[in-house]
From Swiss-Prot:
It is an enzyme of class 5 (isomerase). NAD(+) binds at residues 8-39. Catalyzes the interconversion between UDP-glucose and UDP-galactose and the interconversion between UDP-arabinose and UDP-xylose. Cooperates with UGE2 in pollen development. May preferentially act in the UDP-galactose to UDP-glucose direction, therefore displaying a role in carbohydrate catabolism. Pathway: Carbohydrate metabolism; galactose metabolism; Nucleotide-sugar biosynthesis; UDP-L-arabinose biosynthesis; UDP-L-arabinose from UDP-alpha-D-xylose: step 1/1; Cell wall biogenesis; cell wall polysaccharide biosynthesis. Substrate binds at S134. This is Bifunctional UDP-glucose 4-epimerase and UDP-xylose 4-epimerase 3.
Length: 351
């Protein structure tokens, strides 16, 4: 526990999938946590389950606020009432397809919300942030694994918001060097807390692979659409770097500790992935093994803007954050199925 004992962390989007898992780890490590979330793509039940997982004592260190970063007053209210040592900024919309159809919604949520957050942090002299970036900033990389100093490019409005927010972070740090900002580029987060009490519960039809497979397995959807079966990969399906959400959560704690301990961190990006590529069909097969369920698939044409293979180089995070993913694909599928099996309708009762 050490120096983190009463450090107070603001977690935006803390009721979401990665947010809840990270909050559990932060509380277990002795941090105080305040969540702000507008529950646009999450539910307050997830926060109740976090309290249940950490127990009554640690729960006293967790505060939840319903609020929206697009409304500066909501952020101001938090900062005027208490001092924050750092911010972990998860809040934002994250569906690639939706961003193409409704880019203004993405610019409003992801850009305006973050700019308001920076303004308020500056006003109250809280100048440390861990930011949720994404492997989408690599676009369709010419070579893999993706290394942090690759040239960045975005393929869709969602990716552009992440890329632009990275640039904003670099600009703020260049102008005001006392800021310390770590940009975490997530690859493909999957799995769930081993208890099966929290996990990913997207509203509507999921746009990423695991919740989709999961909804087929529990009978909510008839089959899995596999987009692209003619890629130049081992089985024709696209290859991605899937990472267990608990590994990702630990990566945030490692990043936070780095902010507190390294005065020279500046504004730095780290990949959070396993460094291993897994194809969509391999993932389906691994999930079938974990769940004992057959997943019917339908082979569909490629989606525009989807890359063939994207996986991380993880050396920089290993070396500088002392962090390395522990879980493999089998454990990811095991924990995903445990969550799905116990909560076939997510945090809701069956509708």
């Amino acid at each position: 526990m050490g120096s983190s004992v009463e450090q107070n962390i603001l977690v935006t989007g803390g009721a979401g999938f990665i947010g809840t898992h990270t909050v559990v780890q932060l509380l277990n490590q002795g941090f105080k946590v305040t969540i702000i979330d507008n529950l646009d793509n999450s539910v307050v039940e997830a926060v109740h389950r976090v309290r249940e997982l950490v127990g009554p004592d640690l729960s006293t260190k967790l505060e939840f606020n319903l609020g929206d970063l697009r409304n500066k007053g909501d952020i101001e209210k938090l900062f005027s009432n208490q001092r924050f040592d750092a911010v972990i900024h998860f809040a934002g919309l994250k569906a690639v397809g939706e961003s193409v159809g409704n880019p203004r919604r993405y610019f409003d949520n992801n850009l305006v919300g973050t700019i308001n957050l920076y303004e308020t942090m500056a006003k109250y002299n809280c100048k440390m942030m861990v930011f949720s970036s994404s492997a989408t900033v690599y676009g369709q990389p010419e070579i893999v694994p993706c290394v942090e100093d690759f040239e960045l490019q975005a393929m869709n409005p969602y990716g552009r918001t992440k890329l632009f927010l990275e640039e904003i972070a670099r600009d703020i740090h260049a102008a005001e060097p006392e800021w310390k900002i770590i940009l975490l580029r997530y690859f493909n987060p999957v799995g769930a807390h081993e208890s099966g009490r929290i996990g990913e519960d997207p509203k509507g039809i999921p746009n990423n692979l695991m919740p989709y497979i999961q909804q087929v397995a529990v009978g909510r959807l008839p089959e899995l659409n596999v987009f692209g079966h003619d890629y130049p990969t081992m089985d024709g399906s696209a290859v991605r770097d899937y990472i267990h959400v608990m590994d990702l959560a630990d990566g945030h704690v490692a990043a936070l500790n780095k902010l507190f301990s390294d005065s020279k961190i500046g504004c730095t990006a780290y990949n959070l992935g396993t460094g291993q590529g897994t194809s969509v069909l391999e993932m389906v097969s691994s999930f079938e093994k974990a769940s004992g369920k057959k997943i019917p698939i339908k082979l569909c044409p490629r989606r525009a803007g989807d890359a063939t293979a994207v996986y991380a180089s993880t050396q920089k995070a290993e070396k500088e954050l002392g962090w390395k993913a522990k879980y493999g694909v089998d454990e990811m599928c095991r924990d995903q199925w445990n969550w799905a099996n116990k909560n076939p309708w997510g945090f809701q009762k069956k509708p």
